[in-house]
């Protein structure tokens, strides 16, 4: 019996090969960057891309955003055929645009259209950071301007969801010009008593944050969204000081009076419905402070 203990055959565990490790289809699981929990992507999508464990708000593409907000089958897109060119002859720019078109099934970094939210008509623009990081080039600026003009002509509110790394460097000063163009269009719309609602999502930075994203009658943001003009390290190096940990977050901006509210994605549609209803029928906004 004692002899058997020392002569017992060793057992070995089999280690999966590299090929076996890759048998899990890409994209079926998603890891939360905040709490590190791994979850099924389809379950995350069902939860409007909000982590079920820590409430982290993952980026949404334009299609997902529109489906989560607009009344069913009410959204009609316009100007979807507009395509960016390469006015400065920037090397490789057209190839990058084509690659993003194939990856996202979008022609540009913003989707614009008209539909209803809770039965209330509105023109909506939704930026998509998966296309050139949501950067603002000539076509993005033109589509947003045309959407504002459409809202003005139809006398309906204009709602924009921003997600952008800023102006598109491959278009140089032409992209920077979109800051003035979109801001001017919003000014003219506002003079006609048009309602402007801006919702800043992660990330909203650079020239976008410094122009139309901050010009709403109501400026909202999603929890944890990065919002700012220059990068954190650049600011610290310029002023020679360490910035607060929560600097440039939605919560920091709310605390310092630069936002009207930080709204959880679950509450976004109802909040917009209430606002649109209030501006159509009259009322107060005390509920927004709850």
Swiss-Prot record:
Coiled coil: none
Record keywords, A-Z: ATP-binding, Cytoplasm, Fatty acid biosynthesis, Fatty acid metabolism, Lipid biosynthesis, Lipid metabolism, Metal-binding, Nucleotide-binding, Transferase, Zinc, Zinc-finger
Pfam family, one: Carboxyl_trans
Activity regulation annotation text: Inhibited by pyrrolidine dione antibiotics moiramide B (CPD1) and CPD2.
Localization terms from the record: Cytoplasm
MF terms in GO: acetyl-CoA carboxylase activity; ATP binding; carboxyl- or carbamoyltransferase activity; zinc ion binding
Any one GO cellular component localisation term in the record: acetyl-CoA carboxylase complex
Zn finger residue spans: C4-type: 32-54
Chain residues that bind Zn(2+): 32, 35, 51, 54
EC number per UniProt: 2.1.3.15
Protein family per UniProt: Belongs to the AccD/PCCB family.
UniProt keyword Chaperone present: no
Annotated pathway: Lipid metabolism; malonyl-CoA biosynthesis; malonyl-CoA from acetyl-CoA: step 1/1
Record's protein name: Acetyl-coenzyme A carboxylase carboxyl transferase subunit beta
Entry function: Component of the acetyl coenzyme A carboxylase (ACC) complex. Biotin carboxylase (BC) catalyzes the carboxylation of biotin on its carrier protein (BCCP) and then the CO(2) group is transferred by the transcarboxylase to acetyl-CoA to form malonyl-CoA.
Record text on subunit structure and interactions: Acetyl-CoA carboxylase is a heterohexamer composed of biotin carboxyl carrier protein (AccB), biotin carboxylase (AccC) and two subunits each of ACCase subunit alpha (AccA) and ACCase subunit beta (AccD).
PROSITE patterns listed in its UniProt record: COA_CT_NTER
Single biological process term from Gene Ontology: mycolic acid biosynthetic process
InterPro entries registered for this protein in UniProt: AcCoA_carboxyl_beta (IPR034733), Acetyl_CoA_COase_Trfase_b_su (IPR000438), ClpP/crotonase-like_dom_sf (IPR029045), COA_CT_N (IPR011762), Znf-ACC (IPR041010)
All copies of domain CoA carboxyltransferase N-terminal, residue ranges: 28-290
Reactions listed under catalytic activity: N(6)-carboxybiotinyl-L-lysyl-[protein] + acetyl-CoA = N(6)-biotinyl-L-lysyl-[protein] + malonyl-CoA
UniProt xrefs under Gene3D superfamilies: 2-enoyl-CoA Hydratase, Chain A, domain 1 (3.90.226.10)
Cofactor note: Binds 1 zinc ion per subunit.
Cofactor(s) listed in the protein's UniProt record: Zn(2+)
């Amino acid at each position: 019996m004692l002899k058997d203990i020392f002569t017992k055959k060793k057992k070995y565990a089999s280690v999966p090969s590299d090929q076996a490790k890759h048998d899990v289809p890409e994209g079926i699981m998603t890891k939360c960057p905040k709490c590190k929990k791994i979850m099924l992507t389809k379950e995350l999508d069902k939860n409007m891309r909000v982590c079920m464990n820590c409430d982290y708000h993952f980026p949404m593409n334009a299609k997902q955003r529109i489906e989560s907000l607009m009344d069913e089958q009410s959204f009609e897109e316009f100007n979807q055929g507009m395509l960016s060119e390469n006015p400065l002859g920037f090397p490789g720019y057209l190839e990058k645009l084509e690659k993003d078109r194939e990856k996202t099934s979008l022609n540009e970094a913003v989707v614009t259209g008209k539909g209803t939210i809770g039965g209330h008509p509105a023109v909506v623009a939704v930026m998509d950071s998966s296309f050139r990081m949501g950067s603002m080039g000539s076509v993005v600026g033109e589509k947003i301007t045309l959407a504002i003009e459409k809202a003005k002509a139809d006398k309906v509110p204009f709602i924009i969801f921003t997600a952008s790394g800023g102006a598109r460097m491959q278009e140089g000063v032409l992209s920077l010009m979109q800051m003035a163009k979109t801001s001017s269009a919003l000014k003219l719309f506002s003079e006609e008593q048009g309602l402007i609602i801006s919702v800043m999502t992660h990330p909203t930075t650079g020239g976008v944050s410094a122009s139309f994203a901050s010009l709403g009658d109501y400026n909202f943001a999603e929890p944890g969204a990065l919002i700012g003009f220059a990068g954190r390290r650049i600011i610290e190096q310029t002023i020679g000081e360490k910035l607060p940990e929560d600097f440039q977050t939605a919560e920091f901006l709310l605390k310092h009076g630069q936002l009207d509210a930080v709204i959880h994605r679950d509450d976004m549609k109802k909040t917009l419905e209430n606002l649109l209803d209030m501006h159509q029928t009259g009322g107060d906004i005390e509920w927004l402070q709850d």
